[in-house]
Regions:
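Aromatic/hydrophobic beta-strand junction motif of beta-rich domains
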Residues: 23-29, 122-128, 222-228, 323-327, ...
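Short strand-edge motifs at loop-to-beta-strand transitions and within beta-strands
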Residues: 55-59, 156-160, 254-258, 355-359, ...
Length: 492
């Protein structure tokens, strides 16, 4: 017998391994052979081969042969009656396990088994790969393109790790195993998502009470809103450089919010925000903010030089009096003076000049009472106002009448025979000084106010000689206004 061949050998050529349960054999013998028969049970039962051509005989098993190793016995007989036998060992293998592929546990960086990873070169574990596997191939589909890679079998079993970094995105992997018999098996596809980074889009101090975006608030319980990508599942905040953390809550709108439950101290603070996505990526961002809840109470006073009456009585004879404003903090963003006069109020915005806060009306004020209040707002939105200051503008006074009381002639002729003339001066009630002179103002004598306000009397203390005189009377009111009037009289 020259040769025995397993025609449907499905593995490596001539390895006598097939996945066909009906093996087919070809026997090559000399041309004078006239009978070829085959047996799979050691010669107990024989089947006759069919001559295909001179010296070539064939036989395909008509019924299924069991899985496993077999010994084929071939017997050839020539026309002279010579008989020869030869055997062939062959194996039938029709089974192959279905492989599986899974993301390696340490590289499944999100929730376990969610097939999310932040590793650009993740490792995959291949299981249920039979020992007789001749080829193990991993197909990777990404962005519409499929690429195949050979898996490796090491001490830890079959594994696959990409040779270069994968870009972020979805990857679908499937395993194809071919055994030595040519059986092929495919895994169920596995889709993994590579997500290697996350961002924090914005951090907003919601109760920013100053200029929007200046991160200044007068709230001791600051409220923060954090905007992040939709795959973020944890947002936490810290005010002490990460020593302690609090978890934000996701709102219905998708933003993450947190209102500090305890009072935060006055001053500057650094908020640290950490966002973690479902792949386990982390992003950190900081926000500087300031809590300012205090604002000094301003004061307003009439300038000393314009307080023309008794110091501190807030009466002035200036039509455009000046006012000094104190207690204005350096972080004041708006300073206003509210002036109320005759039931009408006007708000006037002030600016600091040469480091000084001062207010002077732009035009003359008419006589009367004016109530001034200073309102201050700082950059944090705190507000404070002064106690009201009421000033009286009084720019004029008059002398109503001068009477020679001891007029001894015709009433009103201002002639007297008394060398101690007695004068009565009638003035407004706010006059607080009345003085008299008969020497052109060289010397003065102060009149005395009577029990009736506005009536002042003066008796000349020394003898006045006979003759004509000009009495000069000067009245000064509480605002410092002066009025002068003369009276001609005769002592005879």
């Amino acid at each position: 017998i020259d040769r025995i061949e397993l025609v449907n050998d499905s593995g490596e050529p001539a390895d006598n391994l097939t996945n066909d349960v009906r093996p087919e054999f070809r026997v090559t013998v000399p041309e004078d052979v006239n009978r070829v028969r085959l047996s799979l049970d050691g010669g107990r039962k024989w089947v006759d081969a069919t001559k295909a051509s001179a010296g070539v005989w064939g036989y395909a098993w008509p019924s299924d042969v069991t899985e496993g190793a077999h010994v084929l016995t071939v017997e050839a007989t020539d026309i002279a009656g010579n008989t020869v036998m030869r055997t062939l060992d062959f194996t039938i293998d029709t089974t192959l396990s279905t492989p599986t592929i899974e993301l390696d546990g340490p590289d499944d960086t999100g929730v376990q088994s969610d097939n999310l990873t932040n590793r650009p070169q993740p490792t995959f574990i291949l299981k249920h790969v039979d020992a007789d596997a001749a080829s193990v191939v991993v197909s990777v589909k990404h962005g519409g393109t499929t690429t195949t890679f050979a898996a490796t079998n090491g001490a830890g079993g079959w594994r696959f790790t990409p040779a270069s970094d994968w870009a972020d995105g979805a990857y679908t992997l499937s395993v194809t195993v071919t055994d030595k018999a040519g059986n092929v098996s495919h895994s169920v596809p596995l889709t993994v998502n590579v997500d290697t980074h996350v961002t924090i889009d914005s951090i907003v101090l919601v109760n920013d009470s100053g200029v929007i975006g200046d991160n200044l608030t007068n709230e001791v319980r600051p409220h923060f809103r954090v905007t992040v990508p939709g795959d973020v599942n944890v947002v936490r905040l810290s005010l002490n450089d990460g020593k302690t953390w609090v978890n934000a809550t996701q709102s219905a709108a998708g933003d993450w919010e947190y209102i500090w439950p305890d009072d935060v101290t006055e001053g500057k603070h650094t908020l640290t925000v950490e966002a973690t996505d479902i792949a386990g990526n982390k992003a950190t961002q900081m926000l500087e903010f300031t809590i300012d809840t205090t604002l000094s109470t301003p004061t307003i006073r009439l300038d000393t030089v314009d307080d023309s009456g008794v110091p501190g009585d807030n009466i002035t004879n200036e039509k455009m009096p000046g006012f000094t404003i104190n207690g204005i903090d350096a972080d004041a963003s708006q300073v206003m003076v509210v002036v109320t006069h005759n039931g009408k109020s006007e708000e006037l915005t002030l600016t600091q000049v040469s480091g000084r806060w001062h207010f002077t009306p732009d035009s003359d004020w008419t006589d009367g009472n004016y109530t001034l209040t200073v309102k201050v707002e700082d950059k944090a939105g705190n507000m404070s106002q002064s106690s009201p200051l009421t000033v009286t503008v009084d720019t004029q006074t008059v002398i109503n009448s001068i009477v020679l009381v001891n007029d001894s002639g015709i009433v009103g002729d201002n002639m007297t025979n008394n060398v101690h003339p007695h004068f009565r001066v009638t003035v407004p009630e706010d006059v607080n000084v009345v003085r008299l002179s008969i020497d052109g103002g060289t010397t003065w004598g102060n009149a005395t106010q009577s029990a009736v306000k506005g009536i002042w009397n003066y008796n000349w203390p020394t003898d006045v000689g006979d003759g004509k005189y000009t009495l000069m009377v000067e009245a000064i009111d509480a605002a410092g206004n002066k009025a002068t009037q003369t009276l001609e009289f005769i002592v005879d």
